Structures are given as structure tokens and as C-alpha cells.
């Protein structure tokens, strides 16, 4: 068996991952000698970019849904906490596998079943990319309109989106180290600007009582706001492996998890609470958060708000989304031989048209609500199943076997049944189906939502249902690590000894 090492074209120690240079590694296993990241970097990577309009809008929606300040505050707090716990479930995996979360998911779902994770994460990455590009473009045109009276029409918006996509593409092309350093720089700046939001809008703040609830009554609307808040940290779960794969396998999983959890929770929570606080000053415009915050902000805050909230943090998040999509595409059979940065450039062109279609030609808020509902109902059970598998195998993986899809004729530990773990797929499907039965949105109402007085429990039920079915199914079939095929590393060792 020749060239078993995934990414053998780049020898150990020869991969490039420097600030300002194009990263040469893809989804191949990162050699130990190249794993120079520290666990604390997960904090800065997932804290810094949260203070962008595309992420903050998830907090402003709590006010837009009709909640008062304190109800919105607690919905955001509870949602952020629970969503961050789901994020925590997949945080320790990538340092053990040396690759991203989508490829790592093959341990639970099978080497072919990993494509389920690819589909879910592509949906998330492209969805957020669209949101972030659109809100950055809005920030530009509304700020320039306030300063110079320029147009806010479709032409100006289209030009602004094109500019944002080009800048975003540069970050995604450069890759891991450049993105990590950028997020590190944003961390301190984001804390300062985030706190300035409270100062800038304090004179106009009022703890509005709410009452005009989007879903008719308080609790269904409160849970919708909590679900929206939870979706933000959950949406980052598939991305954590992009950065964790450069952390040494010897790093403590508890330390890795603690830094990741702290970064995602504090970043999402503070950004969304700040957005909700500001939105009380323009509650009637809260659905159009970018326009509302730009037009009602005091003059002294317009420039830092544009540079950090509208551009730097938003573009950093968008670049991370595009990087994730391009990195994962390298594991698709038709794109095995295409370089990551080539894929990133191609995706940028596609997203420009997609952004126009989804947010300009149609209703942005309706599409956003649909996106959140589908994303959280499908991603939560996927992440919970991966987390349970990690606990069952006690963090022990066979990294080479995860790359069997790239080795002709190879199977390995994670082959299961034809490359798919049926137990995991059934569990995920059961979780999604159960979750949709409890869904309560303006677009879709599940048949069981009336049993909980209209409260949307879709993502909670999806995660619980999928996790329970997977745990029971795995224990019953007694296949905690996977199938009966020998590890590829053992096969390689036998071949070497046989030719010696």
C-alpha cells in the first residue's frame, strides 16, 4: 500500500502557514512538527470576530420580535450558554485527528458518511457568508449616505457587496495563520468598541416593556429569541476544527475545551447583548438593524462603528466562513486535486450572485429565520453525535483511517457498512425529524408544537433525540469505535515488515 499518508505530496515540516502567506495545507493530517498553535488561540479566534453586524443582528432580533429589554437579555444569555455547550461538544476533536471537523466526523458517520457533515457545514458557511457580505455592504452605503448623502439604492449596494467579497476572498485565500492573527488583533479592539456601544446608546436606551410579540404570546416569542441566540455559537461549531487541527495532540482536552467555550460564549453573548441594548433606541427599525444603528448613532461613534462593527469584524467572520467552505471542498471527490485557494476564489464569485438572490431580490428577515431554523435543527444533532462518539472512544482516533476516501481501495476502521455508519445516520435523521415536529416559526409549524403551548423546542429536541438514539444504538451494536476493518496504519506496518 503506497502513499498512505494523506497529503503525502507535502512532507512533514514542509507545509507553510505564515502570516501574509498562502497556507499550503488542506484537509490532510497536520504533522506534529507543524502544530504550533496554542489552546488559548481558540479564545481569540472565536471572540474577536463576533462584534460584526452580521453576528450582532441575532441579538437585535430579540427586540425586533417584540421582547422588552430584560426578557431579551435573558433570552440571549440562556441561548448563548446552551449553544456554547453544543459548540463545546466538538471542540476537543480536531487536535486529536489533525484535520477539520468535517473529515473528523467520519469517525462517527463513516468515511463516506462524512459528506453529511460537509453538506451541513457548507449550508452554514455559505449562509453566514451571505449575511455578513450583505450587512457589511449595508454598513458602507448607510454610513456614506449619512456623511455625504450618497445613494442607498441597488446599484450602490451591489458595488459595495462586490468590494466586500474581494477583500474577504484575500483573507480566505491566505488561510489559517493570517485569519488567526487577524482575529487576535480584533479581540482587544472588539472589547473596546463593544463597550462603547453601551456608552453611545445609553442616552437613548429605555427598557421597553415589549408586548407586540411576533408569535402572539410571550413564551413562544422568548424561546424563538433564545433559539436565534443559540444558533450563533452553534453555527461556529463546524469551524472550530479549522483552527484546532494546528494544536498539538498532546494538549489537554479540558484546556482546549475551556478556551474554546470561553471565547465563543463571551464573544457571542457580549456582541448580542450590546446589539439588543442599542436596538431599544430604534425598536421600530430593529428588523433593519444596520440602518437603524447607523442612523441613530451619535456622530462621534459612526467611524469606529463602520470600521470595526461594519467592516473589520464582519469581514473576518466572512473570511472564516469562506475558508471553511473552501477547505472542506478539498475532501469532495470531484475537487481532490483542486487547490484550496482556487476553490475560495471560485466560491466568491458564486456568492455575489447568491447574495443578490437571497437578500436583495427577496425578504431578508424571512430568509434569515428560515436559515436559522434549518441550520440549528440539522447541525445540533450532528454535533451532539460527534461529541458522544468522542466520549465513547475516550478521544482516541485513527487519523489515517479518516482519510481512507482519498486512498484507492482503502477501508480502515471507519468503513462501517459501505463507508457509512447506519446507526449514526438513523440517529441524526430521528433527531432532525423530532426537532421539526416541535418547530414554531412564521414559516413552519410542527404537529407537536401545540403540546408545548407554541414554544419552539426544535433544536433542543433534535439534539436530545439524535444523541439518545445514537448512544443506545451504538451500545446495542457494541461498535464504539467503528467497523471490523483493520486500521490502515496496521496494514501499512504489515506491508513494510513483509517487504523488509
Predicted regions and their residues:
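Hydrophobic, membrane-embedded alpha-helices of multi-pass small-molecule transporters
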Residues: 39-56, 198-205, 214-280, 300-321, ...
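Juxtamembrane transmembrane-helix boundary signature
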Residues: 75-109, 118-133, 474-481
Amino acid at each position: 500500500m503506497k502513499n498512505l499518508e494523506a497529503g503525502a505530496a507535502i512532507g512533514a515540516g514542509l507545509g507553510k502557514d505564515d502570516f501574509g502567506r498562502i497556507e499550503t495545507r488542506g484537509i490532510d493530517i497536520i504533522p506534529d512538527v507543524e502544530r504550533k498553535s496554542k489552546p488559548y488561540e481558540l479564545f481569540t479566534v472565536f471572540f474577536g470576530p463576533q462584534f460584526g453586524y452580521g453576528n450582532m443582528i441575532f441579538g437585535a432580533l430579540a427586540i425586533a420580535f417584540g421582547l422588552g429589554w430584560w426578557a431579551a437579555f435573558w433570552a440571549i444569555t440562556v441561548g448563548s450558554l446552551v449553544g456554547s455547550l453544543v459548540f463545546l461538544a466538538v471542540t476537543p476533536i480536531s487536535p486529536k485527528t489533525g484535520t477539520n471537523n468535517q473529515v473528523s466526523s467520519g469517525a462517527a458517520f463513516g468515511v463516506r458518511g462524512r459528506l453529511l457533515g460537509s453538506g451541513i457545514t457548507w449550508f452554514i458557511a455559505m449562509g453566514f457568508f451571505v449575511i455578513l457580505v450583505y450587512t457589511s455592504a449595508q454598513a458602507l452605503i448607510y454610513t456614506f449616505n449619512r456623511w455625504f448623502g450618497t445613494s442607498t439604492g441597488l446599484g450602490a449596494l451591489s458595488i459595495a457587496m462586490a468590494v466586500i467579497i474581494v477583500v474577504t476572498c484575500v483573507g480566505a485565500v491566505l488561510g489559517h495563520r493570517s485569519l488567526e492573527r487577524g482575529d487576535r488583533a480584533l479581540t482587544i479592539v472588539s472589547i473596546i468598541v463593544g463597550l462603547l456601544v453601551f456608552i453611545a446608546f445609553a442616552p437613548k436606551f429605555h427598557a421597553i416593556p415589549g408586548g407586540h410579540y411576533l408569535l402572539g404570546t410571550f413564551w413562544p416569542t422568548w424561546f424563538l429569541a433564545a433559539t436565534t441566540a443559540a444558533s450563533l455559537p452553534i453555527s461556529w461549531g463546524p469551524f472550530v476544527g479549522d483552527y484546532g487541527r494546528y494544536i498539538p495532540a498532546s494538549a489537554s482536552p479540558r484546556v482546549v475545551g475551556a478556551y474554546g467555550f470561553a471565547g465563543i460564549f463571551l464573544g457571542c453573548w457580549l456582541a448580542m447583548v450590546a446589539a439588543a441594548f442599542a436596538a431599544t433606541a430604534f425598536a421600530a427599525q430593529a428588523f433593519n438593524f444596520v440602518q437603524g444603528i447607523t442612523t441613530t448613532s451619535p456622530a462621534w461613534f459612526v467611524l469606529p462603528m463602520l470600521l470595526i462593527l461594519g467592516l473589520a469584524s464582519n469581514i473576518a467572520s466572512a473570511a472564516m466562513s469562506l475558508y471553511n467552505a473552501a477547505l472542506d471542498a478539498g475532501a469532495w471527490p470531484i475537487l481532490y486535486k483542486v487547490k484550496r485557494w482556487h476553490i475560495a476564489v471560485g466560491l466568491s464569485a458564486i456568492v455575489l450572485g447568491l447574495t443578490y438572490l437571497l437578500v436583495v431580490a427577496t425578504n431578508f428577515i424571512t430568509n434569515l429565520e428560515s436559515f436559522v431554523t434549518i441550520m440549528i435543527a440539522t447541525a445540533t444533532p450532528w454535533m451532539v453525535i460527534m461529541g458522544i462518539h468522542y466520549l465513547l472512544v475516550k478521544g482516541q482516533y485513527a487519523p489515517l483511517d479518516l482519510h481512507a476516501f482519498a486512498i484507492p481501495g482503502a477501508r480502515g476502521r471507519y468503513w462501517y457498512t459501505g463507508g457509512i455508519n447506519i446507526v449514526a445516520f438513523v440517529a441524526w435523521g430521528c433527531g432532525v425529524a423530532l426537532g421539526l415536529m416541535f418547530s414554531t416559526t412564521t414559516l413552519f409549524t410542527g404537529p407537536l408544537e401545540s403540546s408545548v403551548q407554541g414554544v419552539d423546542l426544535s433544536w433542543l429536541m433534535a439534539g436530545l433525540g439524535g444523541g439518545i438514539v445514537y448512544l443506545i444504538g451504538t451500545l446495542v451494536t457494541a461498535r464504539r469505535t467503528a467497523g471490523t476493518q483493520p486500521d490502515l496504519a496496521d496494514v501499512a506496518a504489515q506491508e513494510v515488515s513483509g517487504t523488509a
